[in-house]
Amino acid sequence: MKNKDVNYFKLQAKNLYRDYQTKQPYIDDVDGQTYYQYSPKYFDIDQLFVDYDWDEENFSLMKAQHLIANMVGFNKWADLLKAQPEELELAHLLLDNQEKIHLEDWNMYIARIEYDNRVVLDPASKLEIFKKVFLEEEGHHSPFPPYKLSQK
C-alpha cells in the first residue's frame, strides 16, 4: 500500500506542476502590473498560491512536491516519503475528501479529541477515526473550497 500511496502523491505533484505550466501573463488595466492566469485541470492553483504564499515566478516540480506534502499535513516531501503506511493512507484520504473537511479543521478535530481524552493518537487511530466519521457518515461539508478540482 505504501508504494501505491507514494506514487499517488508523485502523480499529484506532477499534475500540480502541469497546472502551473498553463500560466499566461497578463497586464492588469488598473495597476499596470504583470500577473498570471492559469487554465488548471487538476488544482485550484490560484488559491493554492495565495493560501500557501508561494512564488509564482520560481515554481518547480520539487516545489510542487513540497506543496503537495504541505497540503496533506507533512512539513516537507521527504517526511511524506518516510511516513508510515497509515499516515500515507490518511493523507490520501484528506486530499481526496477536502470537500468534507479541510486539513486545518481535521488537525483541530484531532487535537480536540486528544485534549479531551488526554491521549496522543497514533496514525492507525487517526485513520480509523477519519474513515468512521468522514467516510461512513454523510453530511460533512467543509466551508472551504477544495484545492483539488473535481475530475469529470
Labelled PLM ranges:
Residues 1-152:
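Long, non-globular segments of proteins
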